[in-house]
Amino acid sequence: MSKQINAIRGMNDLYGDQSHAFDYLVQTAESVLKQYGFQSIRLPIVEKTELFARSIGEVTDIVEKEMYTFEDRNGDSLTLRPEGTAGCVRAVIQNGLAHNQIQKLYYTGPMFRHERPQKGRYRQFNQFGVEVFGIESVDIDAELIALSARLWERLGLQNLELQINSLGSQAARQAYRDILVAYFEEHKSQLDEDSLRRLSTNPLRILDTKNPDMKALVEAAPKLMDHLDEASKQHYEELKAHLDDLGVAYVENPNLVRGLDYYNRTVFEWVTTELGAQGTVCAGGRYDGLVEQIGGKPTPAVGFAMGIERLMALLMDNELVHEENGPDVYMVLAGDSTKRPGLVISEQIRENLPDIKVQMNCGGGSFKSQFKKADKSGARIALVLGEDEVNQKQIAVKYLREEREQEMVPWDQMVTLLKTALTESK
């Protein structure tokens, strides 16, 4: 017997309830986004490595340590995408989608990072990304946050906290960076190994440390908010005013900096305490310089990404996936002569009642075993077809979830009965 081949560590199969929760989440998100005028875009999983080095930043943890990068047969360096925004920006530039027009786009799919797998953090994970191009005013920032809040409401998710901050302009952030480096240089002995490395590469990320021993040091650090340019201050105040008008509660977090270099001004995260250390389920912000940085014309842009696996965990832990995944009708067949008419009847139901899910018993089995399968499937009705029923062109209708008598129905009346029993009662 050959040795069993398993999935790669940190890359998981989704099936059963997980797969259903995945579909439910994506379908709900798509319905909300379409209410706000968004359109879908499909993006490649593999991009040129240069794209991520230019956009995310060469000295970020993602580019330095976490990307799956390889050379193809032509010697080109390619990378499995670690996030979706850079690829979406590349597509917008390449296809001229943002030329003198506003684009509101969303996408979903797998991302890849070589991290240490743990609950809520995987090497292959799925994201739902939302991006807007061509709007500079702060009202679109507020609308995106309101959109995410609307999605949580639609899903029934509670206990999510919105944290917001402003990173200001690139010039203001550079000036603040120098101030921050000087502060941490004075307290270098208190920095952990990771922060010492970031001090020379990406010092703002020190503010995002999860090391409890550095909490007091970080809290006492100079605040970026005190060094913002006037335009960014006004932008931030207007954002808060919009959120107040919309009734979206928020917490100001001066240490919220995000792990990607391309953000400016608005940044935000939705966090929960229900998932342990990996508490961020949605994060985003404004990235007005990224389109130009990747080779396009200057274009304001803002967006966010949701971690699908983390949101799935919240939905399943709180039993919020309500839609039934099993069939409505289970077809029980007795005898070889019932297989062909059973198949025809099943197709007639699907053709006339497309919202009704029909599962036909295949592979034989006794009446008893078939009824066990029907009951286990969650079906509300079992249609029973034996040789006598075939000869009489009738079918027995057995109600599995109601105290009702079994009845015999002519084939030509079956669709009408099912429509009344199932469709009108849904």
Curated annotation (Swiss-Prot):
A Pfam family the protein falls into: HGTP_anticodon
EC number: 6.1.1.21
GO biological process, one term: histidyl-tRNA aminoacylation
Keyword presence, Plastid: no
Compartment(s) of residence: Cytoplasm
GO cellular component: a single term: cytoplasm
Catalysis performed (reactions): tRNA(His) + L-histidine + ATP = L-histidyl-tRNA(His) + AMP + diphosphate + H(+)
UniProt keyword list: Aminoacyl-tRNA synthetase, ATP-binding, Cytoplasm, Ligase, Nucleotide-binding, Protein biosynthesis
PROSITE patterns: AA_TRNA_LIGASE_II
Main location: cytoplasm
GO MF, any single term: ATP binding
Domain of life: Bacteria
Subunit-level organization: Homodimer.
Family: Belongs to the class-II aminoacyl-tRNA synthetase family.
Listed PANTHER family: HISTIDINE--TRNA LIGASE, MITOCHONDRIAL-RELATED (PTHR43707:SF1), HISTIDYL-TRNA SYNTHETASE (PTHR43707)
Annotated protein name in UniProt: Histidine--tRNA ligase
Organism: Hydrogenovibrio crunogenus (strain DSM 25203 / XCL-2)
